[in-house]
Amino acid sequence: MHFHERFDVIVVGGGHAGTEAALAAARMGSKTLLLTHNIDTLGQMSCNPAIGGIGKGHLVKEIDALGGAMAIATDYAGIQFRTLNSSKGPAVRATRAQADRALYRQKIQNILQNQPNLRIFQQAVDDLIVENHQVVGVVTQMGLAFESPAVVLTTGTFLSGKIHIGLENYSGGRAGDPPAIALANRLRELPIRVGRLKTGTPPRIDANTIDFSQMTEQKGDSPLPVMSFMGDVSHHPKQISCWITHTNEKTHEIIRGGLDRSPMYSGVIEGIGPRYCPSIEDKIHRFADKSSHQIFIEPEGLNTNEIYPNGISTSLPFDVQLNLVRSIKGMENAEIMRPGYAIEYDYFDPRDLKNSLETKAINGLFFAGQINGTTGYEEAGAQGLLAGMNASLQVQGKEAWCPRRDEAYLGVLVDDLSTLGTKEPYRMFTSRAEYRLLLREDNADIRLTAKGRELGLVDDARWAEFSEKLESIELELQRLRGQWVHPNSPLIHALNPHLNTPISREASFEELLRRPEMDYSKLMQIEGFGPGLEDPQAAEQVQIQVKYSGYIQRQQEEINKAVRNENTGLPLTLDYKEVPGLSNEVIAKLNNHKPETIGQASRISGITPAAISILLVHLKKRGLLRKSA
C-alpha cells in the first residue's frame, strides 16, 4: 500500500542524528518525513545525560552555527555547565553540560513539531525500495510504502541489536525497544561492507540510597557558560551538583571474580567496544596496575531519583553489578533501578560513503550516526545535519557540500571515516584535528554560519544576530588598531600599574592587548581605554584574534599549502591497476578505499608522496585533473 504523498527527503530514526537530519532538510525547504518507531522517544538520551566535552563540544557548536537544535536544547535542559580545559589555550577549551533527560527530550520534540516542511510518522521501517541503484522509498512494518528520491538512515544501535547482561542476551535496539531485524537483513543485501560493534551503559542508581557526604562535590562553573550562540543564561533550568567517588581493590576483586560470566571475556560478544569509553571490567583487565578508577555521580534530571554513575559501564551479571556498586564509597547501601548492559549492533564501513555521507553503491541513500561506526550524541548529530543537508541539496539538483579538515571538526570527522574507516566506535577529540587553533568552539559561527546561510540552514533571526556580532568585532578591532598611547600621554598613569614593564614608545591599544599580562576585560576597565564590547562572545573573539594573530596566520599559511591538491578529484570508476608506476600494495589500497580526492588518497595508510605524484601525472596525461566542490 502506497502512502498518498511523496516526500523530497525521508529520515529513518529519531535519535540525535535523525532529528538533526530531518530539521536540516526541512529548514532548506525540502518536504521531509521523519519515520520513528516511537514518537515519545524522539530526542532520547539513550546513554549518559550529558552533551559536549573535549572535541564533542566543538561539534555541538558547529551544529549550532549551522542552525541545528542540539545546543539550543542543551541550554534549556542543562542542569550543570562547565568549561573544560579552562586554564589551557582556546583551541582545546570545551563546554560540557549535564542535561535533564526529560527536559532535553521535550525541547527537541517541541522544535521538531514546530518545524515547517517536516512531517513525523510513527512506524518502524523494514525495507528500502531500490531501482537501478537509486533509492526510491521505504516500506514500513505494516507494509506502507513511502516514496522519496533521498533517504537518510540513522538507525543507532537498532540494526540486529543484541543486549547482553552476563551470559544472558536478547534482541533489542536499546533497553525497552525492539531491534530492527528486517531492515538489517535488507541492508546486508547491499554491496556495502558490514561489521559488528558494541557499546554499553552503567546501572542506574537510586539517589535516595547514596551517601553523598562520603563523596567529593563537583559544582558547575560561575559565571555559567551557554552552549548555543543564540543561548542565554536565562534559558538554563535550576543548576545542581555532581559528585566524584572511586572504585577500590575490593571492587576490582568482585569484578575479576565475575569475569567468567562476562559476555566480553567469555567470547559471547563479538563486536568491538569504544576504546575511550571502556567498560569497568575492561578497565580492570587493561589497567591491572591501577588500584582505583574515578566515577562521576551524575543526576539524570531535576525530577527523578535516577543517578548515572559515569565510569562503571558494565555487562556483568546483575548480582555482580550489585556487589561492585555496593563496594564503592558512598554506595554501600545503593539500590540499582536499571541494570547496566552491553549492546551489539551492525554498522557499515564508512569508506563506502562519499564525504556527503551518501553511499557510493546506492544513489540517494545516506547514512548518519552509529550506523557509520561512530559513538556519541554529538558525532551523530553532526553527521545527521550533514546528511540531511546533502539529501536536500541532491533533491534540489545542487552539488553536495562537506567542510574541509581545516574548516570544521565535522570535516575532520567525515574525512577520517570516509578515508580511513574504523574498526571500533569512533569518537571525536581535539587531537584528531591538525589545524585545531583555527577550529575553536568560540569561532564556530564565524567559520560556518555564512555558509549555513548560503545553504539555507540559517534562519533570519540567527543571521541578524550573527551579522551584528561580526560587525561589532570588526569595528572594535579597527578601534584598537587605530587608537594609540605614547609615554607622555595622560592615560599612562592609569595604564602603567597594570603592565609588567612601562611602555617606552608609542603603542596601539591592540599592541597593549597583545601583552601577556593584559586581557581585554582588564584593558577596558582602565580609564580612557573603554568602554569596550558588552557582548562577551564578541569580546572573546577580539581578545583571541589579537593575542593569537601570529599563530593563526602561520597555521593559515600551512593550510594554503596543503589544500593546493586537496580537492583534486579522483574518478570513482578509476581502476588503479591502469596507473603505471604504482606498487601492488598501493593499487590494492586505492581500489579498496576508492578515495574521492587526492587529499583523501594521501591520508590512507601506506600511500606515499611518490604514489600521489604518480597519480597526479596520470590524471594530467588523461585530462582528468579536476577540482571537486
UniProtKB/Swiss-Prot annotation:
Keyword terms: Cytoplasm, FAD, Flavoprotein, NAD, tRNA processing
GO terms, biological process: tRNA methylation; tRNA wobble uridine modification
A Gene Ontology cellular-component term: cytosol
Segments traversing the membrane: none
Subcellular location: Cytoplasm
Keyword NAD: yes
Positions of FAD binding: 13-18
Gene Ontology MF annotations: flavin adenine dinucleotide binding
The keyword Nucleotide-binding appears for this protein: no
Superkingdom of origin: Bacteria
Protein's job: NAD-binding protein involved in the addition of a carboxymethylaminomethyl (cmnm) group at the wobble position (U34) of certain tRNAs, forming tRNA-cmnm(5)s(2)U34.
Assembly with partners or alone: Homodimer. Heterotetramer of two MnmE and two MnmG subunits.
Family recorded in the similarity comment: Belongs to the MnmG family.
Name listed for the protein in its UniProt record: tRNA uridine 5-carboxymethylaminomethyl modification enzyme MnmG
Species annotation: Shewanella baltica (strain OS185)
Gene: mnmG
